[in-house]
């Protein structure tokens, strides 16, 4: 009898252990993040007309491989800035507005489960991004993009995905610095909340309402950095550290590779990862969640940056989107004129140049302004002598900026230029010094790099001036006259042509430089184009048929006995070739 009781007890104990074991389950979730793809959908650069690295065509091969391993537990997410960059995006933004947008079509085909808005997506304007969002088979998020009419998010703030009983909440946010760069008409009816308080609010709601096992931040904002006025441009790392609840923060926007674990204020580990840009790498995150009786008992997060250039171009993908490839290729292959000489942005750093002065000339003609501001937007862009094609316009003018005319006093014009040249040029103490302001140290045998962003190196046209590089910052500029020889006055108000990025405060040249408050910038705008500058460039070239670009020589660096030889040396350091 005792023997039977012991056997029964043993069987009961074994059954309980088996039941407990059956109640415990380990689930592996794979997250793949693309960010800042910038229209790099095909392994071909439609601007430079050559084969290219990265691309969604390679990402498709990687995603397909991972889905064979993880099935539906493989989650593809896109973190924004997909609608601007290559002509592939431009064509479906503005030329073919009837077909499904190729960015939506491709991500739908690849099985993307969630997307996020980026600042360059906003820059395309409501007509483009509203259409694209509707065509996506997945939600495009934006918790901190607020509809002024309702006070609620304009887009879905978060998405909850359930895989094998594991609930994954994804909270999407964008850098709130949009108004510092973009005209209000592109984001009319909206405003952008700071990321950290927005994250606190929605993490609390998500935890209370959704009972998630994992919380993922999908943030189109970089690691840390710029504070524009009272707005923090890149707050992803701040949110990861200061707002408890996140297991993973997927970053973007700053085009910088990152993969690191940080500890938040609650003492928990958070993976922070950023795949930079152009789909050369993707964020590859592995979540392992163990649940017992419906509760998480163990959770681990590992991440790496997966190199897409180790993967083949997907033939399946290329065949599927062959019609779109052909449409874009036909678009960029259209001849619009002829140019009588080769022009390059490389000359623009060392003085008046045909490349930049062509844009100055166009801005002045379109706007009727007295003065023009313009910077090289591509580091080493070049348009070769001969036929000009639509593709060349993306080299000549990289971004979809509008043209503004603003009212600035003579003193504000000078102060604007003082800041531009202060971040551009070194203060030379001898003829052996660098003319350019480089990152230190400049190592022998290696290329030099600018200390600051070259897209903020604005020169002017419409005025004659010199830049004395022996003087300290704030004292370099001497404006001698208007370009027609009439006097220039510090007190007079002038009409100044410049792009919308600059006119909205981008680069701080108008605010920190000219001393105009952010709030007053909009009041200074007296004219704005309906279309981007590239559109008007194309129109201008088609009308002219043959371009004869030349440097206007309205400004120069002095003293020339120092600056001319220094320019030759610095050109060699920057580009690895002699200045012609």
Question: At which residue positions do the language-model features occur?
Answer:
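Bacterial Sec-dependent N-terminal signal peptides
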Residues: 1-25
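Catalytic centers of hydrolytic enzymes
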Residues: 24-30, 34, 39-49, 53-65, ...
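A composition-driven signal for long, intrinsically disordered, charge-rich low-complexity tracts
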Residues: 4, 171, 501-503
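Acidic, metal/ion-coordinating pockets
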Residues: 21-310, 350-362, 372-374, 528
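Generic detector of low-complexity/intrinsically disordered segments
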Residues: 12-14, 20, 58, 77, ...
């Amino acid at each position: 009898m005792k023997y039977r009781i012991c056997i029964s007890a043993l069987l009961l104990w074994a059954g309980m252990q088996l039941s407990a074991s059956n109640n415990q389950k380990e689930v592996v979730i794979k997250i793949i993040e693309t960010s800042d793809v910038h229209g790099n959908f095909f392994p071909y650069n439609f601007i430079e007309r050559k084969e290219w690295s990265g691309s969604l065509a390679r990402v498709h091969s990687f995603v397909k491989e991972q889905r064979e391993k993880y099935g539906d537990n493989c989650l593809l997410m896109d973190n924004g800035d997909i609608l601007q960059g290559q002509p592939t995006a431009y064509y479906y933004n503005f030329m073919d507005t009837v077909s499904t947008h190729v960015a939506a079509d491709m991500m739908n085909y690849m099985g993307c489960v969630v997307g996020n808005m980026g600042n360059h997506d906003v820059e395309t304007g409501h007509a483009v991004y509203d259409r694209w969002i509707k065509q996506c088979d997945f939600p495009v998020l934006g918790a901190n993009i607020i509809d002024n009419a309702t006070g609620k998010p304009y887009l879905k703030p978060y998405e909850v995905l359930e895989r094998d009983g594991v609930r994954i909440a994804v909270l999407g946010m964008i850098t709130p610095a949009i108004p510092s760069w973009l005209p209000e008409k592109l984001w009319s009816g909206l405003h952008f909340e700071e990321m950290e308080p927005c994250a606190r609010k929605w993490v609390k709601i998500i935890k209370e309402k959704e009972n998630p096992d994992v919380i993922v931040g999908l943030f189109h904002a970089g690691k840390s950095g710029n504070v524009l006025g009272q707005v923090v441009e890149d707050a992803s790392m701040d949110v990861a550290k200061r707002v408890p609840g996140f297991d993973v923060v997927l970053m973007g926007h700053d085009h910088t590779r990152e993969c690191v674990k940080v500890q938040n204020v609650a003492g928990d580990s958070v993976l922070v990862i950023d795949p930079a840009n152009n789909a050369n790498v993707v964020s590859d995150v592995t979540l392992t969640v163990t649940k017992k009786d419906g509760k998480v008992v163990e959770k681990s997060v590992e991440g790496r940056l997966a190199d897409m250039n180790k993967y083949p171009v997907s033939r399946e993908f290329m065949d599927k989107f062959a019609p779109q490839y052909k449409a874009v290729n036909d678009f960029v292959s259209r001849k619009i004129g002829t140019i009588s000489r080769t022009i390059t942005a490389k000359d623009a750093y060392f003085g008046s140049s045909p490349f930049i002065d062509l844009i100055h000339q166009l801005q002045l003609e379109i706007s009727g302004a007295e003065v023009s501001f313009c910077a090289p937007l591509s580091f080493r862009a070049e348009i070769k002598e001969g036929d000009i094609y639509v593709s060349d316009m993306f080299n000549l003018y990289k971004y979809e900026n509008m043209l503004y005319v603003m009212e600035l006093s003579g003193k504000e014009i000078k102060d604007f230029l003082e800041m531009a040249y202060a971040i551009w040029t070194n203060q030379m103490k001898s003829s052996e010094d660098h003319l350019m302001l480089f990152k230190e140290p400049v190592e022998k045998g290696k290329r030099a790099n600018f200390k600051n962003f070259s897209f903020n190196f604005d020169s002017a046209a419409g005025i004659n001036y010199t830049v004395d590089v022996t003087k300290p910052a704030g004292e370099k500029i001497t404006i001698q006259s208007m370009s027609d020889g009439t006097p220039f006055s510090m007190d007079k108000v002038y009409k100044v042509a410049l792009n919308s990025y600059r006119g909205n405060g981008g680069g701080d040249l108008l605010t920190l430089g000219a001393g105009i408050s952010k709030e007053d910038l909009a009041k200074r705008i007296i004219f704005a184009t309906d279309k981007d500058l590239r559109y008007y460039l194309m129109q201008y070239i088609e009308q002219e048929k043959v371009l004869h670009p030349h440097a206007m020589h309205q400004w120069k660096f002095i003293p020339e006995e120092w600056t001319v030889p220094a320019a030759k040396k610095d050109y060699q350091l920057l580009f690895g070739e002699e200045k012609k």
